[in-house]
């Protein structure tokens, strides 16, 4: 009875709060690819941070951790010349969105993403940026001790170059000269949103984190939209099933990915025939392998080198009206100290765009990282 009285009193005194809380409970707001409501995010992050600090106090990190970005500037005339020379010969077998201009557009996200790493992850030993002989305009001598550019030709066999297929590029990340055993892979649309400890990615005993999503690969296929990422993940599962009794149905969260060079080498040793079979695909196809974002993390898990961990990552399409809502929410969260671990400002389909989506993105990133 007292509980009912309190609710009735709340309704009379603060009807807007009453209905807000009622709706949030009945229809919880979700910003991530995890089974957690927005109201749970801050507590989850705080709990994991406290645990990481306890572990940090009782252990010493045994190895360095690097960061790897892949990046392309689709407005570069030299890159465009190569693309227009080769792409038409491979378009017939390419997958959904493989040739969409959004895949190759540069919105200067890399600048903000790299600077977020420098600001919020100062323990990172070195940053490598993998490109097709391109250089970000902002990258000057001031960064030379911390950042190294890696050209595709430095790591990818020349018979597969040029390539415009991110799955192919990601299959060679372990070839980066002087790369540490433990590294974190970023796309340039993934951003650190707050200070993060090394233990969020790798424990002192070398165990990596695997950030699983609650999404279902089976449900994705049943909906009928067959993306190259989905097909490449399903192909990866078939390879994993040759060695492990798996029932994998979860992709990973669209965020950064802790990886190990030794697990790359194991994958190449076990699956060399299948890997060599998809490397000639200069554009994404439905016959690729999803290396960095699926095969290697799950291989690490089944080899006892990774364990599940939570990463609160906001994921949205920068061309969607929802992006404006997310920008406002992220700025508000930052102001009250409840920002997520990361966010992914994704761009994959240029067919539908809000007005001034690029300026909206610039304005938000400038405000968030100012």
Curated annotation (Swiss-Prot):
InterPro entries from the UniProt entry: Stealth (IPR047141), Stealth_CR1 (IPR031358), Stealth_CR2 (IPR021520)
Single Gene Ontology MF annotation: transferase activity, transferring phosphorus-containing groups
GO BP of this protein: polysaccharide biosynthetic process
Catalytic class of the enzyme: transferase
Pfam families per the UniProt record, alphabetical: Stealth_CR1 (PF17101), Stealth_CR2 (PF11380)
Alphabetical keyword list: Exopolysaccharide synthesis, Transferase
EC number per UniProt: 2.7.-.-
Protein family membership: Belongs to the stealth family.
Role of this protein: Part of a capsular polysaccharide synthesis locus.
Note: Stealth proteins are part of a protein family that is conserved from bacteria to higher eukaryotes. Family members were first identified in microbes as proteins that help pathogens to elude the host innate immune system. Microbial stealth proteins are involved in the biosynthesis of exopolysaccharides. Stealth proteins are predicted to function as hexose-1-phosphoryltransferases.
Protein known as: Capsular polysaccharide phosphotransferase
Provenance organism: Actinobacillus suis
The organism's taxonomic lineage, starting at the top: Bacteria, Pseudomonadati, Pseudomonadota, Gammaproteobacteria, Pasteurellales
């Amino acid at each position: 009875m007292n509980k009912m009285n309190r609710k009735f009193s709340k309704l009379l005194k603060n009807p807007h709060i009453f209905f807000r809380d009622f709706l949030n409970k009945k229809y919880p707001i979700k910003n991530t690819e995890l089974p957690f409501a927005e109201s749970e995010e801050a507590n989850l992050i705080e709990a994991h941070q406290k645990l990481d600090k306890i572990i940090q106090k009782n252990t010493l990190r045994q190895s360095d951790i690097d960061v790897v970005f892949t990046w392309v500037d689709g407005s570069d005339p030299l890159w465009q010349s190569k693309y227009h020379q080769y792409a038409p010969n491979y378009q017939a077998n390419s997958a959904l969105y493989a040739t969409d201009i959004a895949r190759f557009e540069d919105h200067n996200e890399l600048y903000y993403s790299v600077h977020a790493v420098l600001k919020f992850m100062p323990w990172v030993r070195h940053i490598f940026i993998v490109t097709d002989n391109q250089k970000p305009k902002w990258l000057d001598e001031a960064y030379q001790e911390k950042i190294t550019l890696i050209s595709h030709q430095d790591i990818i066999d020349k018979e597969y170059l040029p390539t415009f297929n991110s799955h192919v590029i990601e299959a060679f990340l372990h070839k980066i000269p002087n790369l540490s055993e433990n590294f974190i892979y970023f796309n340039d649309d993934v951003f650190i949103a707050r200070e993060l400890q090394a233990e969020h990615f790798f424990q002192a005993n070398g165990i990596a984190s695997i950030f699983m999503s609650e999404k279902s690969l089976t449900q994705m296929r049943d909906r009928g939209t067959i993306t190259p990422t989905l097909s490449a993940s399903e192909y990866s599962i078939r390879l994993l099933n040759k060695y492990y009794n798996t029932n994998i149905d979860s992709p990973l969260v669209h965020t950064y990915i802790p990886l190990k060079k030794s697990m790359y080498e194991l994958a190449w040793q076990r699956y060399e025939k299948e890997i060599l079979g998809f490397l000639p695909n200069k554009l994404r196809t439905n016959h690729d392998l999803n290396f960095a974002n699926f095969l290697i993390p799950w291989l690490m898990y089944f080899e006892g080198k990774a364990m599940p961990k939570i990463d609160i990552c906001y994921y949205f399409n920068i061309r969607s009206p929802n992006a404006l809502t997310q920008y406002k929410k992220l700025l508000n969260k930052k102001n009250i100290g409840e920002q997520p671990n990361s966010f992914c400002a994704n761009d994959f389909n240029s067919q539908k765009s809000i007005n001034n989506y690029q300026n909206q993105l610039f304005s938000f990133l400038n405000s968030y990282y100012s």
